[in-house]
Amino acid sequence: IDASIFEYDENRQLTNTGLASIDYDIEGKTVTVTLNSKDYKWSDGQPVTIDDYIFTYQSIGHKDYTGSRYNSKYENVEGMKEFHEGKADSVSGLEKIDDYSVKIHFKEMRPSMKLAGGALSAYIMPKHIFSTIPVAEWDKSEYVRGTKFVGLGAFKLESIIPGESVTLVPNEHYYKGRAKLDKVVMEIVSPDNIVSEMKAGKYDIAEMPNAQYESYKDLTNVNLVSTFKSSFEYIAFHLGKFDKASGKNITDPKAKMSDPVL
């Protein structure tokens, strides 16, 4: 239901085949992002412009933003740190060229800017939706909590039953054309039941639990497909808090890891 503004190839190198093209100026420390069409639309029919992309950078860098996306990727943009700290009214490094292009000025050019998930943000939000909601209230918004959604993906949200299922239908405004499927229904299934459900042919696609591999590796009615993850998993222990003023993690001396298993 959502789509990145950029596409990438089998080596995770960003390409110019998606919603936008990229022009790197290594010496000038800039990246120019240009929408590949003036006719793109959000799933609610509203036009897509470069203002949506600029708005996304500005909003994630806003001092009231409480999400997890703001990091060194965004702070590498000229003027972002000052904007984030409330010392500037705008981000000086976001230079709008026209309604479909923006030149981003960076403090430093990083190799990962050419990679998916790297130092160039591929995230884009509908300004006409989120500009009407105070940034500090985003986490409570129905557009963030999932009951409503406006995106750029091949499908759009038709209905949701919390804790049970989500039903999607084709997005008639999808930039690559209408999806061939008329409907997609995603259901939450217990890991204890998914093997028997797939064996019975109830679902077309499922993410199978690794721990039960031996119980489904020989099923004749399914094709097993695997891939390398581009991320890592970790366990974090809450032993204090982050002090925003000092920019340091402060350990709580009363916090204890009393579980002997750990």
Name these PLM-found stretches.
Residues 20-69, 197, 256-259:
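Aromatic- and charge-enriched surface segment that lines or borders ligand/interaction sites
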Residues 1-26, 150:
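N-terminal lobe/hinge region of extracytoplasmic solute-binding protein
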Residues 49-56, 101-105, 182-183, 230-262:
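Alpha-helical secondary-structure segments
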Residues 1, 18-20, 113-125, 236, ...:
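A structural "hinge/loop" feature
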